[in-house]
Amino acid sequence: MKAIVYTSYGSPDVLRLKEVEKPEPKENEILVRVRAASVNRTDCANLRAKPFIMRFTMGLFKPKKKIPGTEFAGDVVKVGQAVDTFKVGDKVFGFDDSVLSSYAEYLVFPANKGIATMPRDFNYQQAGACIEGAHYAYNFINKVELRKGQKVLVNGASGSIGTAAVQLLKHFGA
């Protein structure tokens, strides 16, 4: 399969298109044919490994995972033996900020992590680009004791996290 690969940190110039081995799902994973993947702020930070502290989890001198990408949408093409939440043919989207390897034709993903069935009215491009902001916004909102009718100021509501926060807060009644 084809994938975007990097073996050192840096600018987008370090990215290369290469043939790599197609992954196989373990018993609790699914294999997804990637139809759309975005480039978001997490991907840019991972590519450069900045701030430097990121290198303690991503690889001190070079990336541990050679295929970048954190966000995707696609089709389930194979499921591990222990997976009962997804089936072949499901349209799914997901996000993992620890480098998911979504810049490839196929990826494996744990069935019990940040993955869901796509809403019917979403296309692959919409689903593949909407998750990162919502992931962080939901995480922040979930940490506060939000009450229905409470007024909330979202500082920076024009980016992906802020716009997702506004929508989620409205959904939760703030």
How does the language model describe each region?
Residues 98-111:
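A structural motif shared across PLP-dependent enzymes of the aminotransferase-like
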Residues 1, 90, 147-151:
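Nucleotide donor/acceptor-binding cores
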Residues 3, 34, 76, 107, ...:
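Terminal peptide-recognition signature
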Residues 10-17, 41-42:
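Short N-terminal binding/cap micro-motifs at the start of the first secondary-structure element
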Residues 128-174:
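Mid-domain Rossmann-like dinucleotide-binding core that forms the NAD(H)/NADP(H) cofactor-binding site
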Residues 35-39, 113-144:
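Extended, non-globular alpha-helical segments
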Residues 21-38, 52-99:
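Glycine-rich beta-strand-centered segment in the early N-terminal region that forms part
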Residues 44-54:
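Short Gly/aromatic-enriched secondary-structure transition segments
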